């Protein structure tokens, strides 16, 4: 099936409702034999390295398995307060600079930073700055970590669609990352402001933020845009867990102009792991 036919078929599906239904299923406490069989089948299908995570019998639901932690010590964090560490395990989709207020999604497709962040004033802070888009496949570890230490100053929740974010969709659906539901975490770091955008996708029913349990889960029916700026920012450390996808998706990092420089070897398709250096001070 070619890309356009695939996307045309997806247009007919109630993607948000489907994602809520799948999300509910992943939170179902199925009988242990059923649960273990499902997890093992999923791991075989996608090539998940089960040696990196706790034993399967500790997970009460399939969703807990999907957002599984890693065994301690498997993802060392690149040292240096001005070194940007990868927040996720995944593949580079795009990197570049925000030019004319826009980010590149794929060859011949771009989209506005203001639409992505749901906040024009916030987007203006990143005009001309570096960005990186990282795609998490189903096999990947799905927790998100802080790329730098500093303080969380606020967040933005932007409701939207739940298109897939696989390569076929990225090549075909214009403005995909500004269409899908997303949670934007805003940081002040040794490299200035940084935004960590967690973009939802089909069957990615929820994105949770560990730094503030009061933030509502995403993919709620009838949800409205929300924002919050903390009177007392929340201190965080580089490599600390930021949150998790309860199925896979995409993370986009944005930096202030003149503050961060990304490694030029981060070409589309390059694999990265949590804690690996992505760049540093400009």
Curated annotation (Swiss-Prot):
PANTHER family linked to this entry: PHOSPHATIDYLSERINE DECARBOXYLASE, PHOSPHATIDYLSERINE DECARBOXYLASE PROENZYME, MITOCHONDRIAL
Described function: Catalyzes the formation of phosphatidylethanolamine (PtdEtn) from phosphatidylserine (PtdSer).
Keyword Cell membrane included in the entry's annotation: yes
Subcellular locations according to the entry: Cell membrane
Keyword Lyase applies: yes
Organism annotation: Anaeromyxobacter sp. (strain K)
Primary enzyme class: lyase
Modified residues (Pyruvic acid (Ser)): 249
A GO-annotated cellular component: plasma membrane
Subunit structure: Heterodimer of a large membrane-associated beta subunit and a small pyruvoyl-containing alpha subunit.
Keywords: Cell membrane, Decarboxylase, Lipid biosynthesis, Lipid metabolism, Lyase, Membrane, Phospholipid biosynthesis, Phospholipid metabolism, Pyruvate, Zymogen
Record InterPro entries: PS_Dcarbxylase, PSD-B, PSD_type1_pro
Highest taxon above the source species: Bacteria
EC number annotated for this UniProt entry: 4.1.1.65
Active site: 89 (charge relay system), 145 (charge relay system), 249 (charge relay system), 249 (schiff-base intermediate with substrate)
GO terms assigned for molecular function: phosphatidylserine decarboxylase activity
Membrane topology summary: Peripheral membrane protein
Family: Belongs to the phosphatidylserine decarboxylase family. PSD-B subfamily. Prokaryotic type I sub-subfamily.
HAMAP family xrefs: PS_decarb_PSD_B_type1
Site, as annotated: Cleavage (non-hydrolytic): 248-249
One GO BP annotation of this record: phosphatidylethanolamine biosynthetic process
Gene (name only): psd
Predominant cellular place of this UniProt entry's protein: membrane
PTM comment, free text: Is synthesized initially as an inactive proenzyme. Formation of the active enzyme involves a self-maturation process in which the active site pyruvoyl group is generated from an internal serine residue via an autocatalytic post-translational modification. Two non-identical subunits are generated from the proenzyme in this reaction, and the pyruvate is formed at the N-terminus of the alpha chain, which is derived from the carboxyl end of the proenzyme.
Pfam short name (any one): PS_Dcarbxylase
Record-given protein name: Phosphatidylserine decarboxylase proenzyme
């Amino acid at each position: 099936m070619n890309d356009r036919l695939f996307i045309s078929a997806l247009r007919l599906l109630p993607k948000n409702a489907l994602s809520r239904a799948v999300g509910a299923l992943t939170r179902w406490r199925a009988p242990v034999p059923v649960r273990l069989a499902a997890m093992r089948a999923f791991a075989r299908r996608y090539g998940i390295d089960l040696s990196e995570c706790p034993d399967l019998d500790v997970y009460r639901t399939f969703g807990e398995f999907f957002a599984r932690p890693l065994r301690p010590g498997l993802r060392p964090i690149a040292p240096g307060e001005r070194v940007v560490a990868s927040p996720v395990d995944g593949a580079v989709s795009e990197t570049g600079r925000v030019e004319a207020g826009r980010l590149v999604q794929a060859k011949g497709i771009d989209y506005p930073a203001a639409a992505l962040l749901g906040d024009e004033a916030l987007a203006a802070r990143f005009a001309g700055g570096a960005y990186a888009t990282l795609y998490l496949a189903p096999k990947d570890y799905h927790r998100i970590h802080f790329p730098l230490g500093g303080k969380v100053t606020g967040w933005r929740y932007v409701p939207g669609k739940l298109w897939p974010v696989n390569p076929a969709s990225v090549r075909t659906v214009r403005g995909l990352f500004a269409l899908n539901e997303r949670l934007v975490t805003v940081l002040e770091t040794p490299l200035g402001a940084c935004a960590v955008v967690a973009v939802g996708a089909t069957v990615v029913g929820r994105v949770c933020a560990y730094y503030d349990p009061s933030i509502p889960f995403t993919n709620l029916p009838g949800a409205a845009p929300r924002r919050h700026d903390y009177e007392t920012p929340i201190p965080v450390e580089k490599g600390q867990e930021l949150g998790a996808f309860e199925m896979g998706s995409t993370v986009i990092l944005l930096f202030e102009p003149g503050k961060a420089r990304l490694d030029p070897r981060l070409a589309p398709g390059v694999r990265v792991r949590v804690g690996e250096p992505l760049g540093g001070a400009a």
